[in-house]
């Protein structure tokens, strides 16, 4: 019988959330390193036009923006699904002691914590890279006047 089951959700919610956040953190690190290398090697004299420079300077910053703005929501989704599993288990078992419930809730919150752990460094990197992009663009403008 293929369909939605709470047992399947219980088995795969952490795997799914951690996989998505793991891929997001890998991509964020990859693009941060790529931008740092590009910014360190960019030759402003090779550009004739500020628009072409700005296109190259802001390349891949949108990906970082998407990651830092969505990682907390992915974590929150994992937490909500984890809490759903806890409530389901409570309903099926006819009741649980407070200790078991608290352990389950604390484990469900790890998804939100991981989402924030991905989002916060990505936000810091994004803002730093955006500032560096603005500085390089301004240096180009000064150089051309």
Curated annotation (Swiss-Prot):
- Report quaternary structure and partners: The accessory proteins ExbB and ExbD seem to form a complex with TonB.
Name of the protein in question:
Biopolymer transport protein ExbB
Task: Give the species.
Answer: Helicobacter pylori (strain J99 / ATCC 700824) (Campylobacter pylori J99)
**GO (cellular component) term, any one:** plasma membrane
Q: List GO BP terms, alphabetically.
A: protein import; transmembrane transport
Transmembrane ranges, per UniProt, are: 13-33, 67-87, 101-121
What family is it from?
A: Belongs to the ExbB/TolQ family.
What keywords would UniProt list here?
Cell inner membrane, Cell membrane, Membrane, Protein transport, Transmembrane, Transmembrane helix, Transport
Instruction: Give the UniProt subcellular location, in the record's own words.
Output: Cell inner membrane
Membrane topology of the entry: Multi-pass membrane protein
Asked if the keyword Transmembrane belongs to this entry, the reply reads: yes
Q: What is its main location?
A: membrane
Q: What does this protein do?
A: Involved in the TonB-dependent energy-dependent transport of various receptor-bound substrates. Protects ExbD from proteolytic degradation and functionally stabilizes TonB.
Output the superkingdom of the source species. Answer: Bacteria
Coiled-coil positions: none
């Amino acid at each position: 019988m293929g369909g939605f089951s709470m047992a399947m959700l219980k088995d795969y919610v952490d795997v799914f959330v951690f996989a998505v956040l793991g891929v997001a953190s890998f991509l964020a690190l990859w693009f941060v390193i790529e931008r740092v290398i590009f910014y360190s090697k960019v030759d402003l004299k090779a550009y004739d036009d500020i628009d072409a420079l700005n296109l190259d300077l802001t390349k891949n910053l949108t990906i970082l923006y998407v990651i830092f703005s969505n990682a907390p929501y992915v974590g929150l989704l994992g937490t909500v699904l984890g809490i759903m599993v806890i409530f389901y288990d409570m309903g099926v078992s006819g009741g649980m002691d407070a200790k078991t419930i608290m352990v389950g809730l604390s484990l469900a919150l790890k998804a939100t914590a991981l989402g924030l752990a991905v989002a916060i460094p990505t936000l810091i990197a994004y803002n730093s890279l955006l500032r560096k992009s603005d500085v390089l663009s301004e240096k180009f403008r000064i150089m051309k006047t």
